[in-house]
Amino acid sequence: MTNQVAPPSARATPPDEPGPVPGRPLSVLLGLEGLALGGCPINALDLGRTLRGRGHRVEVFAIDEQVRTSLLPYAERSGFRPTLLPQRSSTHARARQIRRLMDASSSDVVHVFGPWLGRAATIAAAGRRPRSAVVTNWMMENVPYVPRRTPLVLGTRRLRDEAEGIQGRKVWLMEPPVDLEADAHDAAAGRRFRRELGVTDDEIAVVVVGRVDAHLKEEGLRHAIEAVVRLGHPALRLLVVGDGDAFDRIQSEADRANRQLGRRAVVLTGSRQDPRPAYDAADIALGMGGSALRALAHARPLVVLGQHGFAATYGPETRAYFDEQGFFGDTSEADPAGHLAAQLVDLLDPSRRAELAAYGRAEVQRYGLRAGAVQLEALYREELGALPGVLGREVDAALLSARAFVHETRFAARGWSGARPARQP
């Protein structure tokens, strides 16, 4: 069954192991799967900042890695100095690293935003002191390697329903949150961004803000570039704001498109530490996941991108679909670029854009940061109140450790070195 927000007293705490007193501030350790600036870590840090503002103690760790654009400046602006853990570690070594951080900060909860960290976090939280691990998976698919008894947070109803059917695991639904105050439309910032890139007032800026990665993102960006080429509209400009492992390939596609059109129709800006002016500059936004929600918060008309050519404009006709599936899709299209071009043609009408912008801004109010932080508080307290006894926790951790050892020994023979799977968007 789906976990609903329940009062802290809804489940009994074992009498020999008192959990946090209802209402007492919690100590929370947040774990980020890497250092690349992107939607998932930004959401995690925003939630951490909001929890801290509500009186809780929040610390952050992140897996160290070499990236084009680091999240560390954003973390520092949010009031955090993440502890960096080595990129390559076995599950047992990673669990020891996390446990040391939990001990140092007297953490009640370790909440990792990256499902591949779930095993290590679960092992780290086991022991005599009642502590809980929580895993958030905001990817667009369920994964098999999250421990079954570890509370799991998913971002769409479809994934939640699917995961609940897997051996009755505990699942919470929480869409990526939006900072409704910071992500409000600023017309002046948008004008400055447009001037910086040479976009005139009479041009139509189609803006994509997000990681330029091979995983999930590259396909949609290629279709967007081809759609601009096919339309050949002299006022249409495509601005791609972000960085990632597919950047050079997408830049090559942009160069090809610009030569074909005889103008600078497609521009890649690279990543920006503050991408909000890019949303403000958009006449039309393209995106998925958290980036799509931020576009709605900025009151921009939105076309949601996905896999296999999926593209759909957010509006009254599609709201039910996105409520169920999340801001993503994987419906195959025979002509992906042509399908996306048709969505853009509909949005060339200024009145249509204004109508959808107002609708999206009204709908996104449901995804505010404060509501997300309140939900996390309830989740943490409920899970801490429902922990098994010391013996049960240690047996679970021992079984999980044994399975992890067998799994990693098997994969080490095939050259696996402790690196993580695909990044969350």
Q: Which role does the model predict for each range below?
A:
Residues R11-D16, A184-V199:
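A short helix/loop element that forms part of the nucleotide-sugar donor recognition site in Leloir-type
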